[in-house]
Amino acid sequence: MQTVRMTTAQALVKFLNQQYVEFDGKQQKFVKGIFTIFGHGNVVGLGQALEEDAGELEVYQGRNEQGMANAAMAFAKQKHRKQIMACTSSVGPGSANMITSAATASANNIPVLLLPGDVFATRQPDPVLQQIEQTHDLSISTNDAFRAVSKYWDRINRPEQLMTAMIQAMRVLTNPADTGAVTICLPQDVQGEAWDFPSYFFQKRVHRIERRLPTKASLADAVEMIKRKKKPVMICGGGVRYAEAAEELKQFAETFHIPFGETQAGKSAIESSHPYNLGGIGVTGNVAANTIAKEADLVIGIGTRFTDFTTASKQLFQNEEVEFLNINISEFHANKLDALKVIADAKEALLALIDELQEIDYQSSYTVEIADAKDAWETELSRLHNIRFTCQDFTPEVEGHFNENLNEYVDALGTQLTQTAVIGQINTLLDKDAIIVGAAGSLPGDLQRMWASRKPNTYHMEYGYSCMGYEVAGALGAKLAEPSKEVYAMVGDGSYQMLHSELVTSLQENKKINVLLFDNSGFGCINNLQMGNGMGSFGTEFRYRNQETRKLDGAIMKIDFAASAAGYGVKTYHVTSLEQLQEALIDAKKQTVSTLIDIKVLPKTMTNGYESWWHVGVAEVSKNQSVQAAYESKVSNLQQARSY
């Protein structure tokens, strides 16, 4: 047997260079590159291996471990899970910073390979710098926290363990049914230890992502169910995008006259203008999709996880005859809502159903309902685009909260811009193939409802975990995946302040991204939630501490985000009017460096809910009568929802 004497880290790098995926006959490198933040826990081990021979891996320098791991996840998401980035950090706080990203990737079923440094396997120098000592179990380190949020976790305590660990890592990373974060913990001493690795460990490995076919039995059951139903609705989930099944879904909708709503992950699989595309569905959905869904007698989920935002906490579907048909590559997700399961690739399942349903000349019973619902939404959308603030008698979209306070915000922020009008203009002015990236706050709701996707795969929303601070890093990842397209991070001031470090990495890599920062001086989405459930405004506006009351009810904070970003070398713009916004967007397209447009918008001018409910933990007992009323409303809505 031929062997090669290498360190564990050197063997890992060599192995990663030999991984390929094949999908529909097309073969490509699986691991594009690796994000690094070096510290004592990885620099002389994995860092040395990368310096000596990185092979074809592109080595990137991150600024924050969570930021770079978010960028790696976004890269894989934009690549439809067919190519990934790895991430390496030092031990302790560096690795802990990636835990949130691991959870984000696993929640979204997006592959990302995390390689955190770890404490010494020999324990000779214990406690090493940045080590936690657990007196009840000395084998525990910070990296054990990854177990809860990883789809596969391993620790390499001996060099020879690397082989089985990495084989299993690749199994999970290339498994469309159960992929997510894979964490391989690398004790810093073991990284540098040498071993005689067999040459066959480094052979070229092609991981074929196969399309699972539906069984004849499940297909027959699905046909029997569909043919009994008159008004079915489909839900286009992220699985439609990852399976590249958009054309088949369109064919299915057109052939059988069945409309579909979009989840956040599924949006832009098919352009918004398609006659059967109702748009966003659920809590952050629009009136068209939710109205049709409420009356549907069959819900066909295609590649969706049926989160509470998609099902409106299982209260959206009100037809007493409603049943569920779930097409999913994952048995776990297909099993939800007592559905009839078709465990299969979305494309293959749709093609098989088309053939079977054409045999019986199936057609839904919709007449004008689909067109009427879309027309009603277009009318509402036009209204949202044209909302303008007036100092007197202005009623915001989220009314009854700040009606008397809005003029204070007008003065403090120097703006009269409404959020819906800003989104409308942005949607009009961006290139058709531009990619928008979002994750948290009020913007995901506005974008799922309002954004018209004009080209496929241009809507990139991380809403499986809704990770605050994902947006800027996500934009960098999307840009690395599609460097020829303009990429825009759609981010609120709250999420931006949590994390935007990879904006600097975009400058370093000359990968231009555009940050559209909506500043309403607060956590506006959560302010809506608390006040909508009977509370006052508490800890969600960005106000100075009042020296008299000792509470955060002083003057509104105004932050010059443009000035801050300009210090990095970003091209920046201040916007307080639609005219300035248009000028900034046009000029930003001409730039070759990353840009940031600081857009001051008024609170409460985002969209509100349409025909949906969200189950949150309202206080059962309170001295506040408004909270008591909110609890009673929750109980009433819960009675109309499925129990599971």
UniProtKB/Swiss-Prot annotation:
EC number(s) on file: 3.7.1.22
Q: How is the cofactor bound?
A: Binds 1 Mg(2+) ion per subunit.
Query: GO CC annotations?
Result: acetolactate synthase complex
Give me the ranges of the annotated region Thiamine pyrophosphate binding.
442-522
Q: Where does Mg(2+) bind?
A: D493, N520
Q: Which Gene3D superfamilies match?
A: 3.40.50.970, TPP-binding domain
Q: In which pathway does it act?
A: Polyol metabolism; myo-inositol degradation into acetyl-CoA; acetyl-CoA from myo-inositol: step 3/7
Q: Which residues bind thiamine diphosphate?
A: E65
Provide the cofactor list for this protein.
Mg(2+); thiamine diphosphate
> Its catalytic activity?
3D-3,5/4-trihydroxycyclohexane-1,2-dione + H2O = 5-deoxy-D-glucuronate + H(+)
The entry lists its GO molecular-function terms as: 3D-(3,5/4)-trihydroxycyclohexane-1,2-dione hydrolase activity; acetolactate synthase activity; flavin adenine dinucleotide binding; magnesium ion binding; thiamine pyrophosphate binding
Q: Which UniProt keywords apply?
A: Hydrolase, Magnesium, Metal-binding, NAD, Thiamine pyrophosphate
Q: Which GO terms describe its biological process?
A: inositol catabolic process; isoleucine biosynthetic process; L-valine biosynthetic process
Pfam family for this entry, one = TPP_enzyme_C
Superkingdom of the organism of origin: Bacteria
- Indicate whether Transcription appears among the record's keywords: no
> Is this entry keyworded Protein biosynthesis?
no
Family to which this protein belongs:
Belongs to the TPP enzyme family.
The role this protein plays is:
Involved in the cleavage of the C1-C2 bond of 3D-(3,5/4)-trihydroxycyclohexane-1,2-dione (THcHDO) to yield 5-deoxy-glucuronate (5DG).
UniProt xrefs under PANTHER family: 3D-(3,5_4)-TRIHYDROXYCYCLOHEXANE-1,2-DIONE HYDROLASE, THIAMINE PYROPHOSPHATE ENZYMES
Its name, as the record gives it, is: 3D-(3,5/4)-trihydroxycyclohexane-1,2-dione hydrolase
Provenance organism: Bacillus anthracis
